[in-house]
């Protein structure tokens, strides 16, 4: 029997997934069922593009529901222990490239709630893996997508 993957996440991320799941079940699912019903009323299903599109959408919605339910079932909530002494999941880390002083900040979260456009990176990303467990003042090499590395200094953990 294989071990089920755990999904580390903040309470905020867990709550957001619960809201998304509720929306999928109570809004999106009924919408798709209605689209299928309307498309069926057009008659012949063999050449009914509306029906095919609605069935595809239904498959996507059901897949999302299943995925989110599984993630919530296997979620591991990262408790905030109040310590800001080292980089950990749920913390925002500010670092600067060495040499240089241009700072960047990212919140390290579980993969389920990662969103680079909101400044949230997955704990499984190369940059987060390099930073986790480090302290303010530490310098670390962060792997870049092109195969090179960038040296950064941790400026702040919040």
From Swiss-Prot:
Q: SUPFAM superfamilies from the entry?
A: FKBP-like, GreA transcript cleavage protein, N-terminal domain
Its GO biological process terms?
A: DNA-templated transcription elongation; regulation of DNA-templated transcription elongation
For this UniProt record, give its keywords in alphabetical order, as a comma-separated list: DNA-binding, Transcription, Transcription regulation
Matches recorded under Pfam families: GreA_GreB, GreA_GreB_N
Q: Where are the transmembrane segments?
A: none
Q: Name one GO molecular function term.
A: DNA binding
Q: Give the family, as the similarity comment puts it.
A: Belongs to the GreA/GreB family.
Q: What does this protein do?
A: Necessary for efficient RNA polymerase transcription elongation past template-encoded arresting sites. The arresting sites in DNA have the property of trapping a certain fraction of elongating RNA polymerases that pass through, resulting in locked ternary complexes. Cleavage of the nascent transcript by cleavage factors such as GreA or GreB allows the resumption of elongation from the new 3'terminus. GreA releases sequences of 2 to 3 nucleotides.
The protein here is known as: Transcription elongation factor GreA
């Amino acid at each position: 029997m294989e071990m089920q993957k755990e999904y580390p996440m903040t309470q905020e991320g867990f709550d957001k997934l619960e809201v998304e799941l509720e929306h999928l079940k109570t809004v999106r699912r009924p919408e798709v069922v209605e689209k299928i019903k309307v498309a069926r009323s057009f008659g012949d299903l063999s050449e009914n593009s509306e029906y095919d599109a609605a069935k595809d959408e239904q498959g996507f919605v059901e897949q999302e529901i299943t995925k989110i339910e599984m993630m919530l079932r296997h979620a591991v909530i990262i408790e905030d222990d109040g310590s800001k002494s080292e980089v950990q999941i749920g913390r925002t880390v500010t670092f600067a490239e060495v040499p240089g002083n241009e700072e960047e900040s990212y919140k390290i979260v579980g993969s389920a709630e990662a969103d680079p456009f909101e400044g949230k990176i997955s704990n499984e990303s190369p940059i987060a893996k390099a930073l986790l467990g480090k302290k303010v003042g530490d310098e670390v090499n962060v792997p870049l997508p092109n195969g090179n590395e960038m040296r950064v200094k941790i400026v702040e953990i919040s």
